[in-house]
């Protein structure tokens, strides 16, 4: 399995590969750098079939198809140059096991088709076509987060060394899978981590959170538990600020208030507002 690093020419590209390097070093896994071309290079981007009635329109159609094909060849060449440049940076950062892939389709399609070869997917909060407004997520990123069967690390614009982490925890299945992953893989070993539970009564913690803490500590992690109250996104992000943490980890499917963290509007709000990178577990399998 590999760490998938999805890169493009957005301002997040450098942060993506730097986070991927950090994950790869923590877990001792190779990196695959992937650049996705939304428009297949083998087909024209527009349908000109209606122009067949007239010779001059037929000539115009053929010229436009030729230009489309030329544009696609340019995009492929530029994509390969991007992959080569980032692969060189990754190797200079100390990762020797690096592969590259140019994929024609969508990011979500690639991850779904190759989930069995991926341990963690690393993506930027917004792609090169999403604009620069920090209040919005790229539509492709939101689609990936909601459908992925692998943990997705949505990175901040700049890489900051991970010295502390916050795990948003509830009693649902997804949080259990998150704890299992963190106990099995040394991603947060050596990094003080807070398990944070949000409820109406911050003083009353479920007994299961102590079990989760013990499970993680047995695996070698340094863990504390914390109860919070209030709106979920506000409470979690405040815990991140208070730590202060450079990484937030959140499961997706629970039956408590954390449930809305990743499957409803609260998730979008949290990802938009978070100034740190967020590792999201949705349907880990």
What are these regions (language model features)?
Residues 1-65, 147, 160-227, 245:
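Small/aliphatic-rich secondary-structure junction motif
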Residues 66-88, 98:
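Alpha-helix-centered segments that form part of catalytic cores
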């Amino acid at each position: 399995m590999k760490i998938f690093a999805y890169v493009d020419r957005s301002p997040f590209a450098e942060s993506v590969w730097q986070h991927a390097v950090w994950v790869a070093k923590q877990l001792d896994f190779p990196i695959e750098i992937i650049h996705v071309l939304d428009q297949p290079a083998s087909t024209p981007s527009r349908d000109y079939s209606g122009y067949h009635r007239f010779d001059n329109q037929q000539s115009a159609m053929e010229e436009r198809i030729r230009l489309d094909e030329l544009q696609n060849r340019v995009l492929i060449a530029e994509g390969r140059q991007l992959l080569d440049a980032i692969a060189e940076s990754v190797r200079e950062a100390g990762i020797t096991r690096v592969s590259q892939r140019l994929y024609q389709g969508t990011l979500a399609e690639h991850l779904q088709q190759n989930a069995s070869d991926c341990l963690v997917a690393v993506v930027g909060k917004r792609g090169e076509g999403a604009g620069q407004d920090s209040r919005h997520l790229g539509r492709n990123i939101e689609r990936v987060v909601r459908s992925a069967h692998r943990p997705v690390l949505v990175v901040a614009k700049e890489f900051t060394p991970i010295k502390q982490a916050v795990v948003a925890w509830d009693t649902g299945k997804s949080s259990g899978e998150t704890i299992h992953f963190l106990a099995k893989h040394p991603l947060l070993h050596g990094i003080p981590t807070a398990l944070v539970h949000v409820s109406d009564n911050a003083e009353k913690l479920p007994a299961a959170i102590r079990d989760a803490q013990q499970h993680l500590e047995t695996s070698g992690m340094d863990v504390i538990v914390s109860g919070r109250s209030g709106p979920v996104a506000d409470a979690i992000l405040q815990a991140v600020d208070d730590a202060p943490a450079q990484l937030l980890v959140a499961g997706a499917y629970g039956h408590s208030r954390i449930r809305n963290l990743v499957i409803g509007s609260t998730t979008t709000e949290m990802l938009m507002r978070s100034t740190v990178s967020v590792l999201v577990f949705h349907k880990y399998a």
